[in-house]
Amino acid sequence: MKNILEYLEKSAQQYFTKVAFTDENHEMTYGSCVECSKKIGTALLELKAKRKPIAVLMDKNVESLTGFFGVVYSGNFYVVIDCYMPKDRIEKIFETLKPIALITDYAHQELALSLHHKVYFYEDLMTTKINQVALDQIRNQMIDTDPLYALFTSGSTGVPKGAVVSHRNVINYASWYK
């Protein structure tokens, strides 16, 4: 395996109608997760970017997970932004990260629009028609050392520091548990 999406899709083939993720308000099947993620990935293709950071500013819920996978389907990497962290900390992360876009939902619209000029709303992304041909083209260009996500810590100096994690890093870690 060279891409974390292969794990998701393999699980979806085996357990299409089984619940993959739950939170206190929703549950999502593997099939729905793949479908929603591909819609997001298709919409993000308009950015014409690869291996670039895209921030995801949403509550910790099943929808945010499809945001992460959707970014990956687009050939880019995601950065989780906690909606409850202070705005100045988010701004410092954005100064370092320079994300090309921000995914959020309407619940966080005001904050999102104050942070970035290119904002995608989850609710709108769910109306996107999946372009499987374009997603396949992007996938064929991906390699295992491509970034999957960036994680920011507080940093000892008070300036957030980021670490980028590749598909290979996560695949190796997951394989270790088999």
Label the predicted regions.
Residues 175-177:
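Conserved N-terminal segment of class I S-adenosyl-L-methionine
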Residues 1-169:
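Carrier-protein-dependent adenylate-forming modules in NRPS/ANL systems
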